[in-house]
Amino acid sequence: NNLKPILKKKFNLDYTPSSAWIKLYEVMKTLPFMISKNNNIYTLSLAEAPGHFMKSIETFIHQRDIKYKTKTNYTWYANSLNPYSQIVRKRYPDFLIGDTFSLIRNYPKRWLWGKDNTGDIMNPDNIRHMKKFITDNNIKLDLVTSDAGLAGDDLFDLQKLEYAQAIGTIYLCSPNKHVVIKHFTPIIFEIKDSIDSTGYFVSLMYLYALCFEKIYFTKPNSSNKKSGEFYLVGYKKKDV
C-alpha cells in the first residue's frame, strides 16, 4: 500500500495503481523480454476486468519509450466475466467486477466475451471463439496474460479454473511469443485435502514446460510473503 502513492506520482498516473498492477510491473522489470520491442505490440489479457494488467503493460511500454526515445503503438484485447450478462450475474454473483477505468464502456469491441457472451473461460467454446476472432483478424499476439488464479478451499473448482486458464493462454498465445499467468501453490496447511492436489499441480506445470522453450517461476517482492501466490512466465511458445 505504501508503494501505490509513490508509483502514482513517479509515473504521473491519473489513477492509483492496484496490487495486481504493481506485481505485474515488477514481473516485467524482472523479465523484460515479456514485452517485445516491436513498433506495434498486441496483448490479450484473460480474467482482466477492470484492466489493471493492461494499464500496467501500458505504463511499462510508455516508460520504455521515454527511456529509449521510441514510439510504440500498443493495442490490447481483453476477456473477463461479462458484468452485463444475466447468466454471469446468476452463476458467479461473487465474482462480478466493476468497470473502474470505463474500459468496457469505452472499448466494447476490445472485450472478447466468447460464444455465449459470458466471458467464462471454463467454457471451451468461448476459448475457441476468441481464437477464431484473433485468427480472422490476423492478430499476432505478443503476450497473453491471465489473472484468474485464486486461492481457497474449494479445491476442485479452483483446479478447473486453473486448468482452463492454462489451456486458454497456451492455445491463444502466438508461436514464439510469451505468457504470464498468476497461480497459487496448492498446499494450504489448514486444509488436509490440499496435499493430495500436488500431483495435479505438478502435472499442470509440466504441461507448461512441454509447450514453451522455458518457464520461469517468480514471486514479486510486492506479493504477500505468507501467500502461495506466484507468477508463471512461459518463454517462447513452441509450435504445438
Question: Which residue ranges define each predicted feature?
Answer:
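Short hydrophobic/aromatic beta-strand or adjacent loop that forms the aromatic wall/cage
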Residues: 227-232
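Conserved P-loop NTPase motor core
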Residues: 45-46, 210, 225
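Intrinsically disordered, low-complexity glycine/charged-rich regulatory or linker segments
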Residues: 1-137
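Conserved acidic residues
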Residues: 41, 142, 213
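Conserved proline-anchored active-site loop of SAM-dependent methyltransferases
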Residues: 44-50, 133-154, 182
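Flexible, glycine-/basic-rich loop-and-beta segments that form/coincide
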Residues: 233-240
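An acidic- and aromatic-residue-enriched active-site/binding cleft used to recognize and process polar
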Residues: 46-51, 81-82, 149, 184-188, ...
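Conserved Class I SAM-dependent methyltransferase catalytic core
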Residues: 154-216
